[in-house]
Amino acid sequence: MTDDDRIKLEPSWKAALRGEFDQPYMHQLREFLRGEYAAGKEIYPPGPLIFNALNSTPLDQVKVVILGQDPYHGPGQAHGLCFSVQPGVATPPSLVNIYKELQRDLNIPIASHGYLQSWAEQGVLLLNTTMTVERANAASHAKKGWEFFTDRVIQVVSEQCPNVVFLLWGAHAQSKQKLIDGTKHLVLKSVHPSPLSAYRGFLGCGHFSRTNSFLEQRGMAPINWALPPL
């Protein structure tokens, strides 16, 4: 049995990523994570939710990709979808600004929670390029191997899916543009929605309406960005 036979992953992704789990970088990443757990470190998101982005949005259903950097590092926040937090947790500042732009762009009322699962289930792949983090230690798992894996995820979407909208917010996300075939897909870029930068162009970018226009022009259902109440 190979390592990728033991990973609990949605079937379409498992087929597309078969072989990644036997790559040397993945063995090194797995050893790093084992060591962190063995040392008693608290790692987010919880193990069953590490691949939640892929498990919530099958490859053949991807319409939109939003890239984040690494998971939230506070207790109870991260659940494997970038920018999203678990129910009952305060909405983080960057997500508040995303909601402000949704309100300005599409007149969608600001949600009372930060749980973006309904976006994922409509085909919005909410992918952090680093998929784990140590509690209270931002970027602690950067450059440990996750980036090789998530770069491959981005490439697979670009290669195998038609007419995807990639939302690249901030320099880190925009560094992944080289992995995307811009002749097949729509790439929209802006500064990050963080309070440090949102007022320099994220607020006013119109990415959500532009995404839906692109999808509708190609005969695809638009994303309902309004979140259901919890």
Swiss-Prot record:
Q: Which GO terms describe its molecular function?
A: uracil DNA N-glycosylase activity
Highest taxon listed in the record's lineage: Bacteria
Please give an example of a GO cellular component term from this record. Answer: cytoplasm
Name where it's found. Cytoplasm
Respond yes or no to whether keyword Hydrolase is given for this record.
yes
What protein family does this chain belong to? Answer: Belongs to the uracil-DNA glycosylase (UDG) superfamily. UNG family.
Which PANTHER family did the record assign? URACIL-DNA GLYCOSYLASE (PTHR11264:SF0)
Summarize the protein's role: Excises uracil residues from the DNA which can arise as a result of misincorporation of dUMP residues by DNA polymerase or due to deamination of cytosine.
- HAMAP family found in the cross-reference section: UDG (MF_00148)
Name listed for the protein in its UniProt record: Uracil-DNA glycosylase
Per the UniProt record, the source organism is: Pseudomonas putida (strain GB-1)
Which gene name does the record give?
ung
